[in-house]
Regions:
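Membrane-interface helix termini and inter-helical loops of multi-pass transporters
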Residues: 19-22, 71-83, 132-149, 192-201
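Hydrophobic/small/kink-forming positions within alpha-helical transmembrane segments
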Residues: 7-11, 15, 37-42, 68, ...
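Hydrophobic/aromatic residues within transmembrane alpha-helices
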Residues: 20, 32-33, 46-52, 107, ...
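Hydrophobic transmembrane alpha-helices of multi-pass small-molecule transport proteins
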Residues: 52-74, 128, 181, 190, ...
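Specific transmembrane alpha-helical segments of multi-pass solute transporters/efflux pumps
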Residues: 1-27, 33, 69, 153-171
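Transmembrane alpha-helical segments that form core, pore/gating elements
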Residues: 40-42, 46, 60, 76-135
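Loop-to-transmembrane-helix transition segments
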Residues: 1-16, 60, 84-95, 140-159, ...
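Specific alpha-helical transmembrane segments that line the substrate/conduction pathway
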Residues: 18-51, 93, 173-192
Length: 224
């Protein structure tokens, strides 16, 4: 379970997501990754016969459409020069999210979130070092490079993975993966705060849809 989580969950998701961004930009890569909740629902239905609730189905649709609207807020989502290869990488990133949402659940209950995430990162790091070893680096290391690496490693990986999987342990893979769709809102907010990006009506509609998923999931859990 831990090997599957580290290799086909964390490592696969991280590499394919950044690969998608490199090919088509963050907008399309993010939207494709948010197909993961649908994949999780299909897997649980086929494997365990677990039918999704009406709230979960509505939330999946709202989260995906909301992400599309939000990523299309400015110039973030464009299919004019859309390489078909990004479809493969984007779907693989969604598979990675589905795998790391489902595979470690029993381990999380048994050992806790932090040890599982730590060993998962260790395994994925070893795999990455073997497959993508680069003895020579051409990166220009300055203060901004260090800050960027810190943000990606600590905030974007360590904190986010631990918070996400703790949520999955508490409420389950489907609602946890749906609620993670709040990520595009934070990206849009920081883009507005630090980069001067503006919000369009489409972007605000997308935000409202994503926030609605939080309300629906909370209401759905109170009913069950």
């Amino acid at each position: 379970g831990l090997i599957v989580f580290g290799v086909f969950g964390m490592a696969l998701c991280q590499y394919t997501y950044f690969r998608s961004i490199a090919l088509a930009g963050a907008g399309i890569a993010t939207v494709l990754q948010y197909l993961a909740p649908s994949m999780i629902i299909i897997y649980l239905l086929v494997r365990y016969g677990k039918r999704p609730s009406k709230g979960e189905m509505v939330s999946v649709i709202l989260a995906l459409v909301g992400a599309i609207c939000l990523m299309g807020n400015g110039d973030g989502l464009s299919i004019e020069s859309f390489p078909m290869a990004v479809l493969v990488w984007g779907l693989l990133s969604a598979v990675g999210v589905a795998v790391y949402s489902i595979s470690p659940v029993d381990l999380l209950y048994k050992y806790g979130t932090l040890p599982i995430v730590g060993f998962g990162m260790l395994i994925s790091g070893i795999v990455a070092a073997i497959l993508f070893h680069q003895p020579n680096s051409y990166a220009v290391w300055d203060v901004w490079t260090v800050i960027g690496c810190f943000n990606v490693i600590f905030l974007g990986t360590i904190v986010s993975f631990n918070a996400y999987l703790e949520g999955v342990k508490r409420i389950g893979a489907v609602p946890g993966s749906i609620l993670s769709s709040i990520e595009p809102i934070s990206a849009a907010f920081f883009g507005w705060a630090f980069l001067g990006n503006e919000f369009s009506l489409l972007g605000l509609i997308g935000m409202a849809m994503i926030i609605a998923t939080v309300v629906i999931i909370a209401w759905d859990r109170q009913r069950t």
